[in-house]
Amino acid sequence: MSSEAPEPDAPASTDDERVSAQLFGEWEIGEIEYDDPSTRRYITVTPIAHTMGRHSEKQFKKSEISIVERLINRLMQTDENTGKKQQATKIVREAFDIVAERTDENPVQVLVTAVENAGPREETVRLKYGGISVPKAVDVAPQRRVDLALKFIAEGTYNDSFKTTTPVEEALAHQLIGAANYDLQAYPVSQKEEQERVAAAAR
């Protein structure tokens, strides 16, 4: 009987055979580039598009959720679409396919660039002096910039698709491409420019 121990089985995976997860099983997320350092920590990209609301009761934890899921959640925030997560997810997936076909780029990268471009840097608040409301320009926090960018993208999608012949996924793709290219005709960019113009006048 041999006293030598049997050779252990080879490991299931090695450093040379890493499996990279993909969003929706299609889109790589490992090489996403960020141009705006101020919003970098608030734009999270993960392969998970549905976290089951685990951060819903924790303040500011929304920044740890994938930016794709946050866009999906934004699309549900109307009377008709409330709670229809599968439908909103399907819209985003189909919009991503359209974006990839038209731009030859990773649609996740297009979304990140669109959010960076659509977030206003300044806005106005109203201060009361002796009963008189006076507008005052203030800087926008990076987390709020991301929130407003997603809001503008969702609003632009509704405006383009509600009571029109344009499919909603087509409208969303149009908003993402326009914002990523900083097209002033795109709703998210025009809203950002308008807020910054009003803020500049209130300095």
Swiss-Prot record:
This is Small ribosomal subunit protein uS7. Belongs to the universal ribosomal protein uS7 family. The keyword Lyase does not apply. GO terms for cellular component: small ribosomal subunit. The keyword Ribonucleoprotein applies. Disulfide bonds: none annotated. Keywords: Ribonucleoprotein, Ribosomal protein, RNA-binding, rRNA-binding. GO terms for biological process: translation. Gene3D superfamilies: Ribosomal protein S7 domain (1.10.455.10). It comes from Natronomonas pharaonis (strain ATCC 35678 / DSM 2160 / CIP 103997 / JCM 8858 / NBRC 14720 / NCIMB 2260 / Gabara) (Halobacterium pharaonis). It comes from the Archaea. Part of the 30S ribosomal subunit. One of the primary rRNA binding proteins, it binds directly to 16S rRNA where it nucleates assembly of the head domain of the 30S subunit. Is located at the subunit interface close to the decoding center. Residues 1-21 are annotated as: Disordered. GO terms for molecular function: rRNA binding; structural constituent of ribosome. NCBIfam families: PRK04027.1, uS7_euk_arch.
